[in-house]
Amino acid sequence: MIDVQSQKDLRGIAIQKVGIKDLNWPIVVMDRANKTQTTIAKITAAAELKGDMRGTHMSRFIEAIDELNVVGPKEIERLLDRIKEKLDSQKAYVRFDFPYFINKRTPVTETLAPLKVDCYFEAEKGEKFDLKVGVIVPVHTLCPCSKEISEYGAHNQRAYVTIEVKMRRFMWIEELVEIAESSASCPLYSILKRPDEKWVTERAYQNPRFVEDLLREVVVKISGDKRIKWYKVFVESIESIHNHNAFAYIEGENTK
């Protein structure tokens, strides 16, 4: 059969990324407590296209993805090598967005339930391999100003901490989640019985955090971790008494 994609293109315009997106695919990721965890990822995969090639072969991306076993740093790099080889490309890109579940016990009744954390792996490889790992962690914040000026109570809300890192050495997803949770007014739990709800309410009140405080607490922990060489942190507070959200952002490198 005629291979239309491989026909010559006379316009001479190279394409930086061409590929597939929003592919829902079962994957297995590493889990600190249970060794592995099965989840569903939404995958984007792309490759650089030479200026004299008319099109890419979309099915070859899926063929390369289908060879994956456990999705980790080494496996992602091998996937990018396969994409480069199958597509005759100098550079390849892939991103996995997926829900990850961490079993947590509540602070008083010790009720066990999973907490969903949205995660992503984003990687590319030309001459060098570059991998970013991201987590989006739901947490609880309580406003220090509201507490200070009020006779009783303080406005509080859910916030989301996005931590994205490039690593020198391996870190568990759970470790990044713990950094976010320990920096907030209080962690979140999927189930709260009344004694747990009391603990969470009082814990947050005793530990108020502006969005700026939360961001800085995360950065203090990340910047002191030698396993991390680069980081990006974004905190968004879903404000409960305002008709807007609040956010804070920082990006940096660990040079040591």
Curated annotation (Swiss-Prot):
Pathway terms, separated by semicolons: Cofactor biosynthesis; 7,8-dihydroneopterin triphosphate biosynthesis; 7,8-dihydroneopterin triphosphate from GTP: step 1/1
Broad class of enzyme this protein falls into: hydrolase
GO biological process, one term: tetrahydrofolate biosynthetic process
EC number: 3.5.4.16
Top-level taxon: Bacteria
Covalent S-S links between cysteines: none
Residues at the site labelled May be catalytically important: 143
GO terms, molecular function: GTP cyclohydrolase I activity
Catalysed reaction, written as an equation: GTP + H2O = 7,8-dihydroneopterin 3'-triphosphate + formate + H(+)
Pfam families in the cross-refs: GCHY-1
Keywords from the UniProt entry: Hydrolase
NCBIfam families reported for this sequence: PRK13674.1-1
Family: Belongs to the GTP cyclohydrolase IV family.
Free-text function comment from the UniProt entry: Converts GTP to 7,8-dihydroneopterin triphosphate.
HAMAP family: GTP_cyclohydrol_B (MF_01527_B)
Protein name as it appears in the record: GTP cyclohydrolase FolE2
Species the sequence originates in: Caldicellulosiruptor saccharolyticus (strain ATCC 43494 / DSM 8903 / Tp8T 6331)
